[in-house]
C-alpha cells in the first residue's frame, strides 16, 4: 500500500546482498591474493576499516539526506541511489587489483559508500509507517532485508565461486564470482530511483495519516 516503503526495502536488501557477500569472502580473497601478508596485521586493518568507514558512511549519508531532504524530499531516494552507483565500480575494481594495499583502499571507499543508504532508508521506514505500526514496520523491514541479503548474498557468491572454480584458480574464481555478485547493485539503484519518484506523494500521505492518528 506504500510503494516508496517497499521500493526502499528492496533497495537496501539488494544493496546489502552484495555487502554481506563481501564480508564473508573478503578475508579469504585477500589471503589468496597475497599469502605472505601478515594475517594478524590484516585482521586488525580489516577491523579498523569496517568499524570506521561503514559507520562514517552511515553518519555522512544521514546528514546529507537530511540536508538535501529539507529542500527536496526526493533526496532520501537520490542519496542512496548515487552512493550505490559508486559502490558498483568500486566493489568490482577492488577484486581486480594486484595488491592488498590497493584493495584495502578501495574497500574503505566501498564501505563508506555502502553505509550511506542506512540513514535515509531508516528515515523512510519510520516516517512512512503509521505511528501505531512503527515497531512492526521495522520488524518487517529487517525480515525482508535478512531474507534477501543475509540469506542470499553469501550463498549466491559461494555457489558462484564453486562454479567458476571449475575453470579458474581460487583467486580468479572469487574475482569473477564477486564481480557477478556486485551486479545486484543494479536493481538496488533502480529501487532507490523508484523511491525518489514516488516518495513525495507517500511522504505527504504519511504525514497526514499520522497527524490524524495522533489527534485521535
Question: Residue ranges of each PLM-predicted region?
Answer:
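C-terminal transmembrane helical hairpin of 12-TM major facilitator-type secondary transporters
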Residues: 71-121
Amino acid at each position: 500500500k506504500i510503494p516508496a516503503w517497499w521500493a526502499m526495502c528492496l533497495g537496501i536488501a539488494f544493496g546489502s546482498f552484495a555487502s554481506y557477500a563481501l564480508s564473508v569472502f573478503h578475508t579469504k580473497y585477500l589471503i589468496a591474493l597475497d599469502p605472505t601478508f601478515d594475517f594478524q596485521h590484516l585482521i586488525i586493518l580489516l577491523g579498523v576499516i569496517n568499524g570506521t568507514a561503514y559507520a562514517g558512511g552511515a553518519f555522512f549519508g544521514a546528514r546529507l539526506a537530511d540536508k538535501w531532504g529539507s529542500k527536496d524530499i526526493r533526496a532520501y531516494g537520490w542519496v542512496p541511489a548515487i552512493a550505490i552507483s559508486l559502490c558498483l565500480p568500486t566493489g568490482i575494481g577492488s577484486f581486480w587489483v594486484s595488491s592488498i594495499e590497493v584493495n584495502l583502499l578501495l574497500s574503505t571507499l566501498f564501505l563508506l559508500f555502502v553505509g550511506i543508504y542506512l540513514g535515509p532508508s531508516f528515515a523512510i521506514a519510520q516516517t512512512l509507517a503509521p505511528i501505531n505500526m512503527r515497531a512492526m514496520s521495522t520488524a518487517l523491514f529487517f525480515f525482508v532485508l535478512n531474507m534477501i541479503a543475509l540469506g542470499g548474498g553469501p550463498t549466491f557468491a559461494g555457489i558462484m565461486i564453486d562454479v567458476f572454480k571449475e575453470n579458474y584458480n581460487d583467486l580468479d574464481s572469487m574475482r569473477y564470482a564477486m564481480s557477478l555478485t556486485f551486479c545486484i547493485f543494479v536493481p538496488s539503484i533502480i529501487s532507490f530511483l523508484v523511491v525518489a519518484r514516488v516518495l513525495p506523494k507517500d511522504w505527504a500521505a504519511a504525514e497526514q495519516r499520522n497527524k490524524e492518528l495522533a489527534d485521535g
